[in-house]
């Protein structure tokens, strides 16, 4: 049986201080209580960037003004394959908050811990931790 491929677009919401906005997955979801980058499934007829902008508004109440593709990869789970599109978002309108009841908070980029995220995020976390940025 072929595994279903699901496209997911998520945002790396990074402020001028080098902090990244994360949310915590709700009870009842896969990987409940894990941290995640805000985003969600790409709907039929949408591009990943369109899905990202829609999901950011729905989930955390911001309007992304820019979105640069940062990382794209697939991760295979026992029953499905997730095709991830991670976008770096440095400009937005609004203050992010958990519109769907999830906790949200800012974390220093250098303090990201892959163990707090679903396994699919390990590669992305590794790349973010290896970056060097000058946030002024």
Curated annotation (Swiss-Prot):
InterPro entries: Mutator_MutT (IPR003561), MutT-like (IPR047127), Nudix_hydrolase (IPR020476), NUDIX_hydrolase-like_dom_sf (IPR015797), NUDIX_hydrolase_CS (IPR020084), NUDIX_hydrolase_dom (IPR000086). The keyword Metal-binding applies. GO terms for biological process: DNA repair; DNA replication. Mg(2+) binds at residues 39, 59. Keywords: DNA damage, DNA repair, DNA replication, Hydrolase, Magnesium, Metal-binding, Mutator protein. It catalyses: 8-oxo-dGTP + H2O = 8-oxo-dGMP + diphosphate + H(+); 8-oxo-GTP + H2O = 8-oxo-GMP + diphosphate + H(+). Its EC number is 3.6.1.55. One of its GO terms (molecular function) is 8-oxo-dGDP phosphatase activity. A motif (Nudix box) lies at residues 40-61. Pfam families: NUDIX (PF00293). Residues 4-130 form the Nudix hydrolase domain. Its cofactor is Mg(2+). SUPFAM superfamilies: Nudix. It comes from the Bacteria. PROSITE patterns: NUDIX, NUDIX_BOX. It is an enzyme of class 3 (hydrolase). Belongs to the Nudix hydrolase family. NCBIfam families: mutt, PRK10776.1. Specifically hydrolyzes both 8-oxo-deoxyguanosine triphosphate (8-oxo-dGTP) and 8-oxo-guanosine triphosphate (8-oxo-GTP) to the related monophosphates, thereby cleaning up the nucleotide pools and preventing misincorporation of 8-oxoGua into DNA and RNA. It prevents replicational errors by removing an oxidatively damaged form of guanine (8-oxo-dGTP) from DNA and the nucleotide pool. 8-oxo-dGTP can be inserted opposite dA and dC residues of template DNA with almost equal efficiency thus leading to A.T to G.C transversions. This is 8-oxo-dGTP diphosphatase. It comes from Haemophilus influenzae (strain ATCC 51907 / DSM 11121 / KW20 / Rd).
């Amino acid at each position: 049986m072929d595994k279903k491929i699901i496209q997911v677009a998520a945002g790396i919401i990074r402020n001028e201080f080098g902090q990244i906005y994360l949310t915590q997955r709700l009870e009842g979801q896969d990987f409940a209580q894990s941290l995640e980058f805000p985003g969600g499934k790409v709907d039929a007829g949408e591009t990943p960037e369109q899905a990202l902008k829609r999901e950011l508004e729905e989930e955390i109440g911001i309007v992304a003004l820019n979105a640069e593709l940062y990382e794209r990869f697939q991760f295979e789970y026992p029953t499905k394959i997730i095709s991830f599109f991670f976008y770096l978002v440095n400009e937005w309108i609004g203050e992010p908050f958990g519109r769907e009841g999830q906790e949200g908070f800012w974390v220093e980029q250098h303090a990201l811990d892959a163990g707090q995220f679903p396994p699919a995020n390990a590669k992305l976390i590794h790349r973010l931790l290896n970056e060097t940025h000058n946030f002024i």
